[in-house]
Amino acid sequence: MNPGETVLPPQLREEIALLAVYLLSSGRGLLEEPADYGIYRCTDGARRALQLLDEHGGSTARLTAVRERLDEVMFAPMGEDRDMGAILDDLCRQMADALPEIETP
């Protein structure tokens, strides 16, 4: 490790590794699952990443709002009629607006 670098807390390191496992296994599952599943797997991956930021103090109000909307989408009853394209377009715009607020070292 170089001077000035920080070590990730063990819990955060584990959670990031678990997110990577989720994304990899989701990619593998897409080879055999219906195509529509991909939308939800990618959406859930984004939700999980934003949840990590929330849990470890790295989020902003705008990012939390995106994660909360993703929670609503992911935990809604199956078969509910919704326009995922419009929802994801809106969330992408919200993410783009939120990115400048993120502090970088």
Swiss-Prot record:
Highest rank taxon of the organism: Bacteria
Signal sequence bounds: none
Function as written in the Swiss-Prot or TrEMBL entry: Involved in the biosynthesis of albonoursin (cyclo[(alpha,beta-dehydro-Phe)-(alpha,beta-dehydro-Leu)]), an antibacterial peptide. AlbB is essential for cyclic dipeptide oxidase AlbA (CDO) activity.
Organism ancestry: Bacteria, Bacillati, Actinomycetota, Actinomycetes, Kitasatosporales
A Pfam family: DUF6092
Protein name per the record: Protein AlbB
Organism this protein belongs to: Streptomyces noursei
InterPro entries: DUF6092 (IPR046074)
